[in-house]
Amino acid sequence: MQYILERAKSVLEEFGGRDVFETAENAGVNVWFRTLGSLKGFYIFENNCRYIVINEELDDITKGVVCAHELGHDMLHRKLSVGGIRENTLFLANNKTEREANLFASEILIPDDDILSALSECDSVKRLSAQLGFPSELIQYKLEAMNFKGYHFKLSDVKNDFLK
């Protein structure tokens, strides 16, 4: 967990702020929008080029979450994707990588202070989700990351595959 949090922090500091699309581009990752049917997105590393492909039919919030998640795969699991293996075939078999990418995404997209501020008005993950505009599963990952940092939030089980 420590490595994921440190990696997310360094990515934000080195490549940009909370605009995940700009951050990805600044990090040298090409972000493309395509029609992908039921697939929300995938990451690919091929011929020393890095790509995040996002379903153009998603709403803007989901596009951002998918981009942050796939950027997590780039920053944490790049070597697992060598040779053009796409997320829908590689990462479904390994929940650890999905969990790590989701934790990374939560750190990239949601500042701790936003959670702490929203808690003055919200008493549940569902309400935090509505207040902050992110999926409740991503909020859960953020709370888990904050617990690792020393906060004490009650957590329920989180699905690794909420972006599938």
Segments and roles (model prediction):
Residues 1-164:
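Active-site hotspot residues in diverse enzymes, especially metal/ion-binding acidic/histidine motifs
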